């Protein structure tokens, strides 16, 4: 028996569970749970969000306000109400939209429970006498984004810049590759589907003829746009498969051989919930890939495997070691047929290493899901830690880190993505053309592996940020962070859980104002790891196989619904660890092929075929 006293500090209101576990000398344990109810703090203030203080008659203006409590927490659970002191001049509906009726001065009051805030507003006579609308293109594909140009004009034909404009669209979907007189016998009478923003950006999900309408100040104008199928579908063909029957497969890496193995290609895969094995493969002839060596360490799971850019050093992670000293293992992979252990490194990494990354003689290793350590491996036999990066938010945790051009991108669940300078080359030393411009490199130059410097971050409102990949669009002037979800929900009446979520495209072109603009989400299952090459996303989708997605051009709306999915494939094997099922973990494009690790059955190599378009989704 014993007593342990703890102090708990609450950072959010709601139900809180505290679990205590006591382990016995023979490996058993007992546990108990205490449920606490943390009440909401009193409300403190209401803040208008970028409000319009000058408005025009005949317009509708949206207002937004945020409520904060005494703990300075944003309270999205509190309902706010808007009103004016003169409904004859301007009046709100219940959604926070203000209708301006006549010129004058009035006061807007926003209230929540026992607090309120006021805003003085002036309405002016509306000078708009007409409205024009034009489209930059008459015909686009599904998924293509266009910006409509709406111009409110005064009596002299001069543009009025600060008048609000609302946009809408209508149309009928056409499910055919061929339009005859802008109609098709395959049309089934469904309405056309797409997205239009408050700025007039439009993207279609279904083919058809769309009528886009702009409205302002009692005037309206229309533009018509024909939308045709995107036609990017291709087929996936199996090139080779290496079956793993004994254990669940985790992640993979592929690389080119060096030294006497120059001209050959190799891969490594880990194992999960097994006995600490990593398999090395010769994939020079991918149709006859074979395991050529095995490394076994004290671990239940070798979750992550990485190879250095020069093809000489390998890193495998360890979780579930018998002595609880996990850490990572440094390997000499110069001869993949005879891989040797150079060093076991577990200094302050005993909580388990889930993911690692190698960049320029340093390993970025996750430590117990709380931080990443930066470890110098310039001499692989004598590694040493040079720094760590850890968030300071309550209850923080980390799942992954990726390093590119000296910028580290970490995925931190609810805290989202953190972008850190660990030795970035300032952009002025590189090409600044749109195919290579990363705005974070324009901010780089102060950080190093021994002195990581945070550049930016964006939280994840869903709390599911599991993996992040930086994407410099090769066909637009955009820089995106592609943030992958990982979460599972229970199936009613069953103990089974099914993965959910997808990929969120965060436009970081303006690093001070990142915006989520698009999402790719498959209806039947959730995402895992992903990779980008050119303007194509390759994704592992657990039970949904691998997915290949066209991410060219500006990205807006529901990418799955827009027919951007190029192909998908489910690798099933009757001799796998789990027979005739698929569960894709990671995917890497390499030398024109797509390699992926299936949790249930091993390593695959596939390729895209049929260059000619086959139609839409």
Stretches with model-predicted labels:
Residues 1-233:
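Extracytoplasmic soluble-region selector
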Residues 130, 177-182, 193, 199, ...:
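Feature marking well-ordered beta-strand scaffolds used for ligand recognition
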């Amino acid at each position: 028996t014993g007593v342990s006293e703890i102090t708990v500090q609450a950072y959010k209101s709601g139900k809180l569970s505290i679990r205590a576990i006591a382990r016995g000398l023979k490996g058993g344990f007992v546990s108990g749970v205490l449920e606490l109810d943390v009440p909401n703090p009193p409300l403190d203030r209401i803040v208008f969000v970028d409000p319009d203080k000058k408005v025009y008659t005949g317009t509708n203006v949206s207002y937004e306000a945020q409520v904060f409590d005494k703990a300075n927490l944003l309270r999205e659970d509190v309902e706010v109400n808007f009103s004016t002191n003169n409904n004859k001049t301007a009046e709100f509906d219940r959604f926070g939209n203000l209708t301006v009726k006549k010129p004058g001065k009035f006061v807007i009051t926003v209230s929540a429970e026992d607090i309120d805030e006021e805003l003085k507003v002036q309405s002016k006579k509306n000078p708009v006498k007409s409205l024009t609308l034009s489209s930059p293109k008459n015909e686009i594909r599904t998924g293509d984004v266009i910006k409509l140009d709406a111009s409110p004009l005064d009596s002299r034909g001069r543009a009025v810049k600060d008048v609000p404009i609302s946009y809408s669209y209508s149309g009928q979907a056409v499910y055919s590759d061929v339009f005859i007189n802008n109609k098709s016998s395959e049309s089934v009478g469904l309405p056309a589907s797409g997205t239009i923003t408050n700025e007039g950006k439009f993207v279609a999900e279904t083919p058809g003829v769309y009528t886009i309408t702009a409205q302002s100040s009692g005037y309206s104008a229309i533009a018509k746009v024909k939308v045709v199928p995107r036609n990017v579908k291709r087929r996936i063909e199996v090139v080779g498969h290496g079956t793993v029957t004994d254990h669940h497969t985790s992640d993979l890496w592929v690389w080119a051989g060096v030294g006497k193995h120059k001209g050959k290609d190799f891969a490594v895969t880990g194992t999960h919930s097994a006995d600490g094995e990593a398999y090395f493969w010769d994939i020079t002839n991918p149709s006859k890939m074979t395991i050529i060596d095995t490394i076994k360490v004290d671990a239940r799971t070798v979750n992550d495997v990485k190879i250095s850019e020069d093809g000489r050093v390998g890193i495998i992670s360890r979780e579930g070691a018998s002595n609880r000293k996990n850490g990572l293992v440094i390997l000499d992979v110069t001869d993949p047929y005879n891989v040797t252990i150079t060093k076991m490194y577990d200094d302050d990494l005993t909580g388990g290493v889930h993911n690692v990354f190698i960049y320029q003689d340093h390993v970025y290793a996750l430590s117990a899901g709380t931080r990443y350590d930066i470890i110098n491996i310039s001499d692989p036999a004598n590694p040493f830690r040079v720094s760590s990066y850890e968030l300071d938010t309550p209850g923080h945790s980390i799942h992954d880190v990726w390093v590119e051009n000296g910028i580290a991108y970490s995925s931190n669940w609810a805290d989202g993505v953190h972008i850190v300078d660990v030795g970035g080359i300032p952009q002025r030393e590189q090409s600044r053309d749109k195919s290579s411009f990363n705005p974070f490199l324009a901010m780089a130059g102060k950080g190093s592996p021994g002195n990581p410097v945070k550049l930016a971050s964006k939280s994840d409102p869903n709390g599911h940020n599991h993996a992040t990949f930086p994407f410099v669009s090769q066909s637009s002037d955009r820089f995106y962070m592609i943030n992958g979800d990982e979460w599972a929900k229970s199936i009613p009446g069953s103990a089974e859980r099914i993965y959910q979520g997808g990929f969120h495209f965060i436009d970081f072109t303006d690093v001070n104002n990142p915006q989520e603009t698009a999402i790719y989400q498959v209806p039947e299952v959730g995402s895992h790891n992903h990779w980008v090459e050119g303007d194509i996303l390759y994704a592992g989708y657990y039970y949904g196989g691998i997915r290949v997605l066209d991410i060219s051009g500006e990205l807006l709306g529901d990418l799955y619904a827009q027919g951007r999915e190029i192909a998908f494939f489910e690798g099933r094997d009757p001799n796998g660890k789990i027979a005739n099922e698929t569960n894709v973990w990671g995917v890497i494009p390499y030398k024109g092929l797509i390699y992926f690790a299936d949790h249930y059955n091993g390593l695959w190599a596939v390729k895209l075929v049929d260059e000619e378009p086959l139609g839409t989704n």
